[in-house]
Each structure stands twice: as C-alpha cells, then as structure tokens.
Amino acid sequence: MTAYIQRSQCISTSLLVVLTTLVSCQIPRDRLSNIGVIVDEGKSLKIAGSHESRYIVLSLVPGVDFENGCGTAQVIQYKSLLNRLLIPLRDALDLQEALITVTNDTTQNAGAPQSRFFGAVIGTIALGVATSAQITAGIALAEAREAKRDIALIKESMTKTHKSIELLQNAVGEQILALKTLQDFVNDEIKPAISELGCETAALRLGIKLTQHYSELLTAFGSNFGTIGEKSLTLQALSSLYSANITEIMTTIKTGQSNIYDVIYTEQIKGTVIDVDLERYMVTLSVKIPILSEVPGVLIHKASSISYNIDGEEWYVTVPSHILSRASFLGGADITDCVESRLTYICPRDPAQLIPDSQQKCILGDTTRCPVTKVVDSLIPKFAFVNGGVVANCIASTCTCGTGRRPISQDRSKGVVFLTHDNCGLIGVNGVELYANRRGHDATWGVQNLTVGPAIAIRPIDISLNLADATNFLQDSKAELEKARKILSEVGRWYNSRETVITIIVVMVVILVVIIVIIIVLYRLRRSMLMGNPDDRIPRDTYTLEPKIRHMYTNGGFDAMAEKR
C-alpha cells in the first residue's frame, strides 16, 4: 500500500512537471525578446483561502517564591517596565471593546469570579457604520470568545506551576501554547545561586537577566505590542527568546513542507494581541496561520518592455505587468493583494484577468497583433536583464562593451541587441555600467523580419487596443469606399455630372440677363414715343382700334350731316 501511494505521488508529480513545462512553452519568450518584451520563467500560484487559529499566552513575570524576599525588589522594577509597555496596549483594547456592542452574552454563576477578558459576539458598531478594521477586530474577539474558558484555565495553571512551556488543545482542535518566560532561568540558576552565592548576588543576577529579557521581549514582540492590529510574528526572535522551536505551533497544520516554507518566507503568520492581564502580567496573542492550496498547471509570469527599433523608428510594446498562463487560458494577473515568495505567488483569490484578443495573440508570438506606441521621450526603459545577460536598444542608446568602453554598433535590421559575459564582460548603457552573470548564455535567436500592430496610446491600454482595431477596420473599408465611389460616378447619367450642372446654371443666368435687357429696351422705346407726340394727336391714316364715331363727334361730322339734310 505504501509503495502504491509513493508511486501515485511520483506519477502526479511527473504530470505536474510536464504540464508546467507545456504551459511555460506556450509563450515564445525568445521571439518576444526581439521586440523588447521580457517575460520571466514564471512562478506557481497558491490560494490562501482560509487559516488556522493558534493562541499564545505569554507569562512575562517568572514565579519567584524565594525565602526572605530575595529578588523582590528586582521583580518590582521589572514590573514597572512592563507597565509602561502594557498599559497603553490595554487602554487601546478597552477602547476597541467599547466600540463593539454585546448582543449575545453568556450567563455565569453568581459566585464565580469575573475574569477580565473580551467576550462578545459582534453585533452593531456603536457609531453605526462598521469599518473593515472594526470588523476584523470584532471577528478576532468573537473567535477568542470560543477559546475563553481554555485560555482562562491555562492562565490559572501557569500561576501554579513552575514549568516554562504548557500546551493545551481546546475542544475545536485549536492549540494554545503557554510560554512562561524566564522560568527555566529561575529554576536552574537563580535558586541554586541563592544557596551558593547568597541572596544579594543572586538578586543582582536576576535583575540583570530581567533587564536583558525586557530587551529581547521588545525585539521579539515589539511590533505586536505596539498596536492592536495584525502584525507578522518574528519566528527567529521568538525561538531564540524562549529556547523552543516555534514551528511546534504548526505541527498540526494540514499542509506540506513547501507551504510552511512559503508562509514563513512571506511572513504571513500574523499575531494580534487580544488580552492584557496586568494582575498576572500575562498577554494573549491570537495567531493566524494561512492554509495554502496550490493551483495545478498555472504560472504567473512577470512581464516588462524596453524600446526597440524598426525601420529607423523607436517603438514600445504595451503588455500587462503580469501574465497568467494556464493550459487553455492566457490572460493578465492582478497581484495587488498577493505576496510573492521565491517560488510562488500567494493570493487570497484567483488573480486571473481577461485581456484583449490582439494582446493574447501578441504574447503567443504573433507580433503583427502587438499593440505598440511610438517613443517620443527618454523615459521608456532602454535595457533589461534576461538569461543572465542584458538586452538593450543600442540605436536609441549609447552602448559600450568591455573595460575599454568599445562602442556597440547595432544592426538596424534588429530590434535589440543581446549582450552576455561571453561577448561583452562589462556592459555600458547610457553611462550605466553593468556586469553580466558569468553563467548567462548568449541569447541569439536569429534575425527576424518583425512586423508589429498599429500605433496606440499607452493609457488606457484596453481602450487603445479597441481603437487600434477600429483603425484597421476603417483603413480597410476606405479603399472599398473609393472603389464604390468610382463605380457610381461612371454609372450615373449626363445630368448627374458636375459639368452639366454648371452649364445649366450659366445658361439660366444668361437667359435672365437677356430678358432684363429686353424689358429695359421696350420701356425706353415707349417712353420716347410718348415724348414725340405730346398733344396725343393721331393722323387719319394711322391705324387705330378706336371707333370712328369718336372723330365724328370731335371734328363736327354730325353737324355737316345735319346741314345736308
């Protein structure tokens, strides 16, 4: 059965390695480097979705029950130092407790002593709106309420025992570690010294040790005692202070050794002071240990860009700061809330983000879809470290090689130049001198005819990419529109032409002018005729439409006729 389990683990590990290799190979890092895009090998992804709770009860004053009050004065002085350290912390906890309304309290026996401890289930915040800090603090208090009885019992037992370490597991499986500081020193050195060296000498040794312990206490828990918020625990200081292996707290964590390493490396073990007991000089800390779950087959790559040259112009490719690659997915990664260890990214949720299709194809090696912007200033990076060497744009920069500062001439058919320790030991870029790694190899992937996408603005990237696609579409449709316009102009009739319209307008204007001239001539002719016959006399032989009878009346025609009769 054991062999079968080991074989299954080996097979799963091999599949994971193969899958990780395939995911890493889908990004052509060599081709992208030719246009100044630098992509690292990537790190795995782990999700910290939940945590385990631990509690540490610190007894800061050792149990001293010497005869004749030996060492009492030194202990009193030591307590005064602790008061100056712990009283402000206790007052802050009291203020925090006052902001939380108790909605569900437990009943206790009337005769039982009321021990001072935070015990409340979160209800409403006194001022109405709960901030995230208040909610976090309230959750810590509510969780501490569940362990109240167990912690109270171990605090009571610590006052009655002379052991330096007590370990208790409560009903829900949460460990409570009790550290009684300096108790071993008192038991092993101070008590024997009283009988050998006398009370005064032993008391002096105790005072020196207490002062030293106070300094070590500030070193180990200074960040935790200085605030009521969450702070990372200093594991090394805690281990050396109490002569114990602090990793014992994590013995029941259901996780692997690599996860424990990542948690320690990123300082994700947080401690919060939840109780200060000035009567017993005990401090209780709530410790949160995150539980990590690795997402198989996922790598997060860190990406960056430097400028490169093509056709005598300097360009810059815009890429996401982090790229998440999965078997069938390639996108961006928002690591704002993530922490980075040496091998992994630890995130509270899946950081995957969608990126435009053109940017995906660019990262996969199709440089014709890469969104670029033209460099107009010197703020764009000109060099970067890759594969133990340096990749630089030596056309837009002044590059030198070796201790003799030999100038580097970059081929204009190449976008960038790759420099390593083999071909250039001391590398200089714009006056900055760099030593390449001796283990770096010469990154020569050959000269490629590079073609990139349309120029865009860097901010915002998504909008610019959409505008770039729209620009390509408009450029393609412009030629088709020109062809359609020519066809329409050829198919149209004669009166649709521009020359015909102009001719018609000119003819109409000429006709209008002629009509006006004719009217003026007729008007002047009639006026001249009226001026030539002022008496309005008309000759007899002149043809007129007026009746002849009128002339008969006017010329005496009727009178002559009457005489004849």
Swiss-Prot record:
Residues 1-25 form the signal peptide. Changing residue 488 to I: In strain: Mutant KD-51 and Mutant KD-51M. The keyword Transmembrane applies. In natural infection, inactive F0 is matured into F1 and F2 outside the cell by one or more trypsin-like, arginine-specific endoprotease secreted by the bronchial epithelial cells. One identified protease that may be involved in this process is tryptase Clara. Unlike most paramyxoviruses, Sendai F0 processing occurs on the cell surface and induces a conformational change in the protein that unmasks the fusion peptide. F0 maturation is a primary determinant for organ tropism and pathogenicity. N-glycosylated; glycans consist of a mixture of high mannose-type oligosaccharides and of complex-type oligosaccharides. Glycosylation at Asn-245 is essential for membrane localization and F0 cleavage. Residues 26-500 are extracellular. Changing residue 387 to Y: In strain: Mutant KD-61. Changing residue 200 to G: In strain: Mutant KD-32 and KD-32M. GO terms for biological process: fusion of virus membrane with host plasma membrane; symbiont entry into host cell. Changing residue 104 to G: Loss of glycosylation, enhances cell fusion activity. Residues 522-565 are cytoplasmic. GO terms for cellular component: host cell plasma membrane; membrane; viral envelope; virion membrane. Residues 117-141 are annotated as: Fusion peptide. Homotrimer of disulfide-linked F1-F2. Interacts with HN and M proteins. The cytoplasmic region mediates the interaction with HN and M proteins. This is Fusion glycoprotein F0. It comes from Sendai virus (strain Z) (SeV).
